[in-house]
Amino acid sequence: MIAATVYCIVGCNTGSPDKDALKVLECDTETGAAKVVQSVNGCEGTTYFQIDRERKFLYSAVSEGKKGAIVRFALDGHRIGEMTKLAELPCETPCHISLTPDEKRVAFAVYWSGVAGTVGIDGSDLKTFTLPNDDMGDNKKRQQKAFAHQTFFLDPKGVGRGEMGVVDLGCDRVWFFDPYTMERRKDLCIKAAKGDGPRHALFLPRSDNKVLYLVNELGSSVSQYAFDGATFTLMGKTSMLPGGFNRWAEDGENLVTKAAAIKTTADGKIVMASNRGYDSIAFYEVGTLGKLKLRNIAKLRGKFPRDFELMPGERFMVVGHKMSNEIQVYAFDREKCTLEPAGDPIPCWRPLCFKFL
């Protein structure tokens, strides 16, 4: 039974004029209506956050001048409470964080420094690793060095330590580590195509972690990999853009669009990925062995859809339009894989991350 009223936490980028770092949306799953019911400040931006399984705490990356930090907010139902600083980082603010499967450590990826690491949920035992600047991608403007963009786990729903993947946009790689020691596994690595610039990885929910999707920011595509527990094998790569669309500017050096987030429906039968520039959501049907078939590319009202999330019940989608500083709710037609605006946009400074409670 899906509740008629649900709550969604929104992370806002640094530099917000109203100083808000987090907002809470109250959403109606039957009509799509949404409104802000809480705004939280006291820190500079929340680039990305994660919520623990018991929904007691929200862990976030925040900015402290030129350095980053990991903080924790207490949750009381849908209310965000007091913030506790857990750890200062020796580098800038992470662009992504996650929790280890046993929820004893916070993992993070720092884009510009090319650093990945973990820290205990009590702020102790900080471990970091600087990704190697080897074998850069072909895009000379975006792949000058290693760029850590995401951390994820081979067994995301497990209770053990798991093994951590780090998506490297600069080197077209996914590296793997022990999250407790940050020792790199030299026998396991995904090598994406040159110039693809991978951004985020996602396991197909119903695949027992045997199918992995990799959204390529620079290539505007989704790669599909089979995983047998020891090796990732490329099954295919599917474009996120319509045929004939030129993703390069007239100078041939600058991209006019780039991919961002990747999600699936709850049953894992539809995969969705967002285009920033060619502002849209690409929808794919999941076929045999997890291979993807493009169903539709739904154009959006706002600019630069950085992140998005389906409401519980999956009749509506909440999209964060970073460059038009707004949140827009869209009605989602699952059969046609289409989106239609539902209501007026909600003003919000550069929304970056959405999580429903």
Regions found by a protein language model. Name each.
Residues I80-F152:
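Asp-box/WD-like beta-propeller blade repeats and closely related beta-sheet repeat scaffolds
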Residues L255-H321:
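Loop/turn-rich, solvent-exposed surfaces of beta-rich toroidal or solenoidal domains
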Residues T128-Q143, C189-I190, M235-N254, I346-L357:
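Surface-exposed loop and turn segments in beta-propeller and other repeat-based domains
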Residues T5-V6, E54-K56, D102-K104, P156, ...:
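Short coil/turn segments that connect the beta-strands within blades of beta-propeller domains
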Residues V24-G32, F73-R79, V119-L126, F177-E183, ...:
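Short loop/turn segments immediately following beta-strands, especially the blade-tip
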Residues S39-C43, L86-P90, K140-Q143, C189-K194, ...:
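Surface loop/turn motifs at the tips and blade-to-blade linkers of beta-strand repeat domains
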Residues V10-S16, S60-E64, F108-Y111, L154, ...:
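Conserved beta-strand positions in repeat-built beta-propeller and related beta-rich domains
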